[in-house]
Amino acid sequence: MKATQKISLLAAVAAVALCGGSAYADSPKAPIAKHVVLIGVDGFGARWIPWDKMPNLKALRDGGLYATGRDSYPTSSAINWATAFFGTVVEVHGYRNWNSAKPDIPPPPAALEGGRLPCVFSEIRRQDPSAYTATLFTWDGIGRCQNTNAASFARHFPGPGRDAYPPRDKSVIDEGLKQLAHKPKLILFYQGQVDSLGHGYGWGSEKFTNACVRVDENIGRIVEGVKKAGMWDDTVFMLVADHGGEGTKHGLANLNCFEIPVVVSGAPVKGRRLVEPVLLADTAPTILAILGYEVPDAMRGRNALR
């Protein structure tokens, strides 16, 4: 082999090696949608969903894709919302308690960008600085499980006591519908009342079921809002939960706590499928892929949509 050929071959091998060591697991592909509406329902375990009382969610499920997914262990809130927004496993994001305000175990240095783990909001900001994003939530822990300063709009709706969650969740919808005027690439509507009333009265109780019904009414408002904003044909709806429950508790190692609903719906996903098993860690990578953005290697979840 001539020297020039050897040099060319070595250069090609080096290039492949460099690509393999890239910070990005997937190269960007053409987006399939312009917008993702993410609905996060705390404590909404798949085994506890009163489908016959939730027509709006049922319509999204029946008109789209559905999988019974799995969350991370322990089956608690901060651990699993971090799993969803950072798109990675507990061993990487390091959140270990239900109310962790920051990683309890330092994330691997190789996974950090600017000293922090990349989340779905920070990746959109990094790759597309002009994109508008919004995150709205009633449990303050949500703000600690994502890089809220990367979102164009972030608001926590505080209030005292378990019974304050239903009106606060409604406030999330009220403000979120206003945010649709900005045509956000990604908007999070978080709902906390299902978890709150599950703790207060038990998963599967009448008050728990009533909370699910109210959340379904809020989902209906979101759907109508997307239509009125002229975003319907270009929007993917995604609904996930952080955990289920049993009695008045969660954090347990059983399917009542592990199994969560994953709904992906909208015109852009017609003819597609979800690759199972779907994990909660797949949330952020799937959203980034839908919008045509790169998925960083730090996100150990995968794009679950094919």
For every predicted segment, state its role.
Residues 26-33, 45-126:
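Active-site nucleophile/metal-coordination loop of metallo-enzymes that catalyze phosphate/sulfate
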Residues 93-97, 112-165:
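Catalytic-site neighborhoods of secreted/periplasmic enzymes
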Residues 38, 56, 211-255, 287:
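Metal-dependent active-site segment of extracytoplasmic phospho-/sulfohydrolases and closely related
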Residues 85, 253-294, 305:
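Substrate-binding rim/cap in mid-to-C-terminal beta-strand-loop elements of soluble/periplasmic
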Residues 69, 107-111, 208-209, 269-277:
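Active-site rim elements
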Residues 141-158, 174-217, 221:
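Active-site His/acidic residue clusters
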Residues 32-36, 63-66, 127-134, 182-187, ...:
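Loop/turn elements at helix/coil->beta-strand transitions in domains of secreted/extracellular proteins
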Residues 8-19:
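Bacterial N-terminal signal peptides
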